[in-house]
């Protein structure tokens, strides 16, 4: 099977987000990239779940391969996810991203629908996201009517650039009135970040219910928890 390693990883992440409870019916997708693949054109290829296929019936061979240069299918019998242009634009805009996950998970989607940012209220959030996970602006009628999925990606990138957010430090976003996207250095890390995003969104909602005036944690505590795992002198976990 061509692109076997990429297809297997993307398949496992798609199955993983279902097992993690982030997906209802077919409301979600995961993708990964191989930026070294020469036959996909400049920039390599991405693999993504086919559109509308039930997860119980999904196999690695079903994963559709798309050129990062053109956004066109280069291998695979099915149609790629309808969200493919969003994933494609994120890969093109954020070179450090190796995997993207989109779901309609309950709590993160609730914040997206409320058009609320997800500020860092505690250390669980700080261990994974270096500050507020932003919500995008609402899309215009023209953006929705023309190339909607591609414009979704463009609005995400616009949000990060205008707010000067490092996509490697905040590997997630809430698309207004839509839902969450998460990413990582590879597709399994993107899946992990999607799981964490849903968990901290649930914690946030319950924190607001207990204390409506709760504030973001102090910068010193945010720095301590994020940098001990991700900083130049990180010491969390075992040495590789």
Feature annotation, model-predicted:
Residues 1-240:
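Glycine-rich flexible loops
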């Amino acid at each position: 099977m061509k692109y076997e390693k990429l297809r297997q990883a993307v398949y496992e992440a798609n199955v993983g987000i279902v097992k993690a409870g982030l997906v209802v019916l077919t409301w979600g997708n995961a993708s990964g990239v191989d930026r070294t693949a020469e036959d996909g054109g400049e920039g390599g290829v991405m693999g993504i779940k086919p559109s509308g296929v039930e997860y119980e019936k999904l196999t690695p061979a079903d994963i559709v391969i798309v050129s990062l240069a053109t956004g066109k299918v280069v291998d695979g019998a099915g149609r790629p996810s309808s969200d493919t242009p969003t994933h494609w634009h994120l890969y093109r805009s954020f070179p450090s991203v190796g995997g993207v996950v989109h779901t309609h998970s309950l709590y993160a989607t609730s914040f997206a629908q409320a058009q609320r940012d997800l500020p860092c209220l505690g250390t669980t959030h700080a261990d994974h996201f270096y500050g507020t996970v932003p919500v995008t602006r609402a899309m215009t009628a023209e953006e929705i009517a023309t190339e909607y999925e591609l414009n979704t990606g463009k609005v995400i990138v616009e949000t990060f650039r205008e707010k000067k957010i490092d996509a490697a430090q905040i590997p997630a976003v809430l698309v207004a009135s839509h839902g969450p996207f998460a990413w990582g250095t590879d597709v399994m890390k993107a899946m992990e970040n999607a799981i964490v995003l849903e968990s901290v969104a649930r914690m946030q909602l319950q924190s607001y219910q207990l204390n409506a005036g709760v504030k973001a944690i102090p910068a010193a505590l945010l720095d301590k928890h994020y940098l001990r795992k991700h900083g130049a002198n990180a010491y969390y976990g075992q040495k590789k």
